[in-house]
């Protein structure tokens, strides 16, 4: 059920099936007979590069993705927690510990079984377990993207290195590839399987499968260059096994393999068709049987999660409950988000590939490009028929898109970087600009955008730790105090128990359970708890909180004389009506509303963190604010806020003084200490007037570094006002 635990397993399987030495030589024979892509106009002298060891490339990618995984500080999709880490936490520690996993659709239970041996109740290791394994999976995906490009364009072609550069410098890859999403694992499995697919079957220039001669010698060689019957069957078997795993994980992945299998069926001989059908049945039934058995062991009953996936999203149309998108979403938003600055080159690559003449399509490399382009169009086209769309649904296509993007990228930038001709300067500047844009987008989305949803959970852990280590309460001496938290946010706005970790943190959040098994009339009027709150916050708080808006607690539960909470985290989370918590967490958009309802209560701001500069959901805009009942914490936060404000103002004054020193006439320099004090006094006076009058037009000083006698409010002199505006 946990994506991160599946990630723990897959690298071992993949690395055991193909060692780095065999991988580096797997393309040698085929590449020696294949020229670079005919779709590129790169001169032959520029189409070759030096050979680099595959193991060295993988080590670089592994280090790069490990840095990538450890640098993630932001929230992307609830599924990266509620369909991976949360179910794993529940499996490891039991339902009573408050994990809130999404088990409606279910993922193969082997994921949770693997992860439960990693998690530890003593330390928040769950926060550090997934990055290394996610980095390994992402690095494998990058490596096999490069390998597929080498297969298509030649081992030493610039196009292969361009494909590697595209995947390494992709903002989407940096933002998404190391997350605990099932789509990330699906993408890695898909690109590895594409490397094992018998592309030669759909190319008329490739000899058909020959009768088996020496099974022992050929079955051990799984390289793509070997056309022996035994080697092709072994390679196909591995490919279909991985493809079946990807389809079990995400049933929509079958669209990729239906397209490739259809082309192979129509363009291959009957013997190859027989082999294909036999292996599809063999691998499909084997993987399906294993999945059903594992699910039976985990759930305790016979179930088939992929069927539930289709029933949930297609038959009951419950996917629409989580959002409805335009039919052109994947064309106008999906591809631009996946490709960012590479989108123009991708469009050129797709056009070139699909406009190839019939005579060139039969060649091996062009045939592979054509099939990759076909599946890159087929999958979004079919998924566009479903109302609910997300860019991550087409994420498995990104490696193939990078392979197709490489030739136009090389054609455009290679002459600019390999020649010193000044005529190529605009292209060089364009390359630098695109790199800067990619780096900026990657850093912002992975470090800053939606970072508050993770930071607030760290704050709650710190508060619980503080109450545990400094416990002076007379009501429970020698024991750790339990704190309570309530999240007045849209559902699944933050991770849950996998990040709260401490079972002494009791928390509840607004829910949004889908209307499963309801009739159509019932679905039409169904409103979940989160929507009920945002539709009418006042009524919701009166009817769904203990005591309503009239009887609110005056001090936190850990300072109250009543007995500490005896209920489990799960029971506290599911209790209705909700208890007023020690800590109330919400987005800044809701602050004015709560101020009007709770202004006479003991709640006050005790922490705030930056979350986003913008958000497509208006309910999630602004900072994340924490109100608490503890007056000591409120006073400490006010004191810290004032201190930061004063430090910021002092810094502003220093900048103003420095600016005045630089702009002052030479005959009155250097300034003595009295001049500096005069300027600082003037700056303070100006700031007070700005805050009081709300305008800078009256905050003016003529030649402030001359003497205090000329400190005048002259509306005609705008010098200092302009400086003040520029500095702020």
From Swiss-Prot:
Q: Output one GO MF annotation.
A: alpha-1,2-mannosyltransferase activity
UniProt KW keywords: Endoplasmic reticulum, Glycoprotein, Glycosyltransferase, GPI-anchor biosynthesis, Membrane, Transferase, Transmembrane, Transmembrane helix
Q: Which residues are glycosylated?
A: 365
Name the source's superkingdom.
Answer: Eukaryota
The membrane topology term of the UniProt record is: Multi-pass membrane protein
Involved pathway(s) = Glycolipid biosynthesis; glycosylphosphatidylinositol-anchor biosynthesis
According to the UniProt entry, which residue ranges have a biased composition of type Low complexity? Answer: 12-46
Output one GO BP term. GPI anchor biosynthetic process
| Chief location bin | endoplasmic reticulum
Transmembrane segments annotated in the record for this chain: 52-72, 246-266, 274-294, 330-350, 366-386, 393-413, 429-449
Q: Region (Disordered) spans which residues?
A: 1-46
Group of enzyme by EC: transferase
> Recorded E.C. number(s)?
2.4.1.-
Gene Ontology cellular component?
endoplasmic reticulum membrane
Subcellular compartments:
Endoplasmic reticulum membrane
Q: Briefly state the protein's biological role.
A: Mannosyltransferase involved in glycosylphosphatidylinositol-anchor biosynthesis. Transfers the third mannose to Man2-GlcN-acyl-PI during GPI precursor assembly.
UniProt xrefs under PANTHER family? GLYCOSYLTRANSFERASE, GPI MANNOSYLTRANSFERASE 3
Q: Which family does it belong to?
A: Belongs to the glycosyltransferase 22 family. PIGB subfamily.
Q: What is this protein called?
A: GPI mannosyltransferase 3
Q: Report the source organism.
A: Aspergillus oryzae (strain ATCC 42149 / RIB 40)
């Amino acid at each position: 059920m946990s994506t991160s635990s599946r990630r723990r397993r897959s690298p071992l399987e993949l690395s055991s099936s193909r060692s780095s030495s065999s991988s580096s030589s797997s393309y040698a024979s085929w590449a020696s007979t294949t020229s670079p892509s005919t779709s590129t106009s790169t001169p032959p002298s520029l189409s070759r590069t030096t050979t680099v060891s595959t193991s060295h490339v993988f080590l670089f990618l592994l280090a790069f993705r490990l840095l990538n995984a450890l640098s993630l500080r932001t929230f992307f999709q609830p599924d990266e927690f509620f369909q991976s880490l949360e179910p794993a936490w529940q499996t490891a520690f039991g339902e009573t510990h408050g994990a809130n996993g999404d088990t409606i659709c279910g993922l193969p239970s082997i994921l949770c079984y693997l992860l439960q041996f990693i998690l530890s109740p003593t330390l928040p290791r769950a926060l550090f377990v997934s990055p290394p394994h996610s980095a390994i999976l992402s690095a494998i995906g990058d490596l096999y993207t490069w390998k597929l490009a080498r297969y298509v364009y030649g081992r030493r072609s610039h196009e292969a290195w361009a494909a590697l550069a595209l995947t390494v410098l992709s903002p989407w890859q940096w933002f998404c590839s190391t997350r605990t999403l099932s789509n990330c694992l699906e993408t890695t499995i898909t690109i590895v399987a594409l490397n094992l697919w018998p592309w030669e079957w759909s190319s008329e220039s490739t000899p058909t499968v020959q009768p088996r001669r020496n099974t022992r010698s050929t079955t051990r060689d799984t390289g793509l260059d070997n056309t022996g019957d035994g080697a092709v069957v072994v390679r196909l078997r591995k490919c279909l096994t991985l493809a079946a795993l990807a389809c079990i994980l995400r049933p929509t992945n079958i669209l990729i393999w239906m397209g490739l299998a259809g082309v192979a069926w129509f363009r291959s001989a009957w013997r190859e068709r027989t082999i294909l059908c036999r292996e599809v049945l063999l691998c499909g039934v084997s993987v399906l049987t294993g999945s059903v058995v594992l699910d039976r062991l985990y759930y305790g009953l016979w179930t088939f999660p992929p069927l539930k996936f289709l029933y949930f999203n297609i038959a009951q149309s419950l996917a629409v409950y989580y959002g409805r998108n335009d039919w052109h979403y994947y064309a106008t938003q999906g591809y631009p988000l996946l490709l960012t600055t590479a989108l123009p080159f991708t469009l050129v690559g797709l056009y070139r590939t699909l406009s190839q003449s019939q005579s060139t399509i039969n060649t091996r490399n062009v045939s592979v490009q054509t099939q990759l382009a076909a599946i890159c169009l087929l999958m979004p086209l079919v998924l566009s028929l479903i109302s609910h769309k997300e860019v991550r649904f087409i994420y498995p296509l990104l490696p193939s898109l990078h392979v197709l993007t490489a030739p136009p990228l090389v054609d455009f930038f290679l002459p600019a970087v390999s020649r010193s001709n000044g005529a190529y300067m605009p292209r060089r500047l364009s390359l630098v600009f695109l790199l800067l844009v990619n780096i900026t987008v990657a850093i912002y989305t992975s470090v800053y955008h939606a970072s508050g949803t993770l930071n607030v959970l760290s704050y709650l852990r710190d508060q619980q730790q503080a109450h545990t280590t400094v416990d002076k309460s007379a009501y429970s001496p020698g024991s750790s105090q339990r704190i309570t938290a309530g999240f007045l946010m849209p559902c699944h706005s933050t991770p849950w128990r996998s990040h709260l970790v401490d079972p002494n943190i009791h928390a509840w959040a607004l829910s949004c359970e889908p209307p499963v098994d309801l009739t159509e009339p019932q679905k039409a009027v169904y409103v979940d708890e989160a929507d009920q709150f945002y539709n009418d916050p006042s009524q919701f708080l009166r009817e769904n909180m203990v005591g309503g808006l009239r009887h609110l607690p005056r001090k936190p539960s850990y300072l109250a004389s009543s007995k500490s909470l005896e209920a489990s985290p799960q029971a506290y989370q599911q209790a209705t009506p909700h208890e007023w918590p020690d800590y109330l967490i919400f987005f800044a958009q809701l602050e004015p509303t709560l101020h009007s309802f709770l202004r006479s209560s003991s709640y006050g701001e005790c922490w705030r963190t930056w979350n986003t500069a913008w958000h497509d959901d208006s309910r999630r805009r602004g900072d994340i604010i924490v109100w608490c009942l503890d007056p000591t914490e409120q006073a400490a936060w006010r004191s810290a806020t004032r201190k930061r404000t004063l430090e910021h103002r002092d810094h502003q004054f220093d900048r103003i003084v420095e600016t005045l020193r630089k702009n002052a006439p030479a005959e009155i320099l250097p300034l003595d200490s009295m001049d500096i004090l005069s300027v600082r006094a003037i700056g303070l006076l100006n700031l007070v007037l700005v805050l009081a009058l709300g305008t800078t037009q009256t905050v003016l000083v003529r030649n402030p570094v001359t003497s205090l006698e000329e400190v005048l409010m002259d509306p005609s002199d705008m010098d200092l006002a302009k400086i003040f505006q520029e500095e702020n």
